[in-house]
Amino acid sequence: MSADKAVFTRRIMGIETEFGITCTHDGAQAVAPDDIARQLFRPIVDRFRSSNIYTLNGGRLYLDVGSHPEYATPECDSLNQLLIYDRAGEVTLNRLADQAEHALADQHIEGTVHLMKNNTDSLGNSYGCHENYLVGRAILLKKLGQEFIPFLITRQLICGAGHIARPHSRFSDGDTTPVYQLSQRADHVWEGVSSATTRSRPIINTRDEPHADSEMYRRLHVIVGDSSMSETTAALKIGSALLVLEMLEAGCSFDEWEIANPSKTIRDISRDLTGRAEVPLRSGRISCALEIQQAFAEKAQQWLDERPEEQHGTPNADMQRVVDLWKKVLAAIDSGDTSSIEADIDWVIKKNIIDRYQDKFGWDLTHPKLQQIDYAYHDIRPGKGIFRTLEERGRVSRWLDGADSSITDAADTPPQTTRAKMRGDFLRVAQENDADVSVDWTRLKINRPEPHDIALLDPFAAHDSRADDMISSILDR
């Protein structure tokens, strides 16, 4: 590995999260999902005449296909910044859910809105958590397909959300017995690398939309991951991916771990909590998820010894925290005793809850209460979701200790180190001055009285004199 190569230790990244939504009263559906989703977005539509907007923090909020609220973080350039802005989306959605409940009450409809940060519903439909990483054009898609995919396929062992797989949603050989799996997303992925997102659901989407200078960058769109409730799980998921991308850019080779059949292997791994399910490699050798992850973690520790420190980006100290957690999780799984990570990793936390109910009541995984727990774990509503309740009581680990006020502030304030700052500042001034404007990831536009727009193709730049001039023109009206 060579730190002299074009390695992005400061990398632009973001997360897009689709949420499940229901409205219940006394355990029964009170409002249909389509209707409650529209009610959730009514304040947005009433104000902006659209259910697809960019927010004051520079992110994006919209109602996706299938009545799924979706939040995309603004561009972030460090691990902790991304985790804060991912949580900030929950703040925004919880505000909307509170307003929706009050609106229902005004209509004399009793109902509680639930927002699930998960990846599958009770009918077996899947919705995503998509990770976006900016990479240079110098790194070839073929190399990513061969050497990044083995990491992505096996990382469910260290950061899966956990899931009771039901017969209708399992990819099985006729066995219809429900089973606890590592990943919610694994059974819904069918290809390694593809330009599709919904039809075939690849691990890496190759549709070339960099939202930046296309001659310099590409946006790596990873759609295989589970949504994370736990901050430590999210930190491990994102942080380990950042390290692997850095190592690939630095010239490290992981071609010995190229997997022969990615779509089958990702399912096999998901059903084996020990990490020892057979993984046939392209070379003909048989490995397992545990061995592959151990190899990546060992290389990551070596990389940290030469990783350059940037003024911005994720500090080496935070990356060392990631590697320490990575090794801790793998050691626990290797030993067969996961008690040391029972407050750190989503699939372990959830499994322990389910195990306790099974031990107490003798239920098997078909019991409706256990299936309810599977979903309630992911409810982001304060005081309603299982995980957030555990977090409030200090029963699970935090990566962002003491950051609650920063998370709340981030719902309305953009990152100060990326292009999102200009977008957020522009929108704030426009809204405060009732100006007719529009934005997207790369453009700012004043619509009236004289149309004027600029393209911002450098996502690393937090300042541009042209953006300052546009803001000044609004203030000078």
Swiss-Prot record:
Catalytic activity: ATP + [prokaryotic ubiquitin-like protein]-L-glutamate + [protein]-L-lysine = ADP + phosphate + N(6)-([prokaryotic ubiquitin-like protein]-gamma-L-glutamyl)-[protein]-L-lysine
Domain of life: Bacteria
EC code(s) of this entry: 6.3.1.19
Active site as annotated: D64 (proton acceptor)
Annotated Pfam families: Pup_ligase (PF03136)
GO MF, any single term: ubiquitin-like protein transferase activity
Chain positions recorded as ATP binding sites: R60, T73, W441
First-tier enzyme category under EC: ligase
A single GO BP: proteasomal protein catabolic process
TM regions (residue ranges): none
Keyword terms: ATP-binding, Ligase, Magnesium, Metal-binding, Nucleotide-binding, Ubl conjugation pathway
Binding site for Mg(2+): E16, Y62, E70
Pathway: Protein degradation; proteasomal Pup-dependent pathway; Protein modification; protein pupylation
InterPro entries: Pup_ligase, Pup_ligase/deamidase
Miscellaneous section: The reaction mechanism probably proceeds via the activation of Pup by phosphorylation of its C-terminal glutamate, which is then subject to nucleophilic attack by the substrate lysine, resulting in an isopeptide bond and the release of phosphate as a good leaving group.
Family statement drawn from the similarity comment of this UniProt entry: Belongs to the Pup ligase/Pup deamidase family. Pup-conjugating enzyme subfamily.
Function: Catalyzes the covalent attachment of the prokaryotic ubiquitin-like protein modifier Pup to the proteasomal substrate proteins, thereby targeting them for proteasomal degradation. This tagging system is termed pupylation. The ligation reaction involves the side-chain carboxylate of the C-terminal glutamate of Pup and the side-chain amino group of a substrate lysine.
Xref: NCBIfam families: pupylate_PafA
HAMAP family hit by this protein: Pup_ligase
Protein name as it appears in the record: Pup--protein ligase
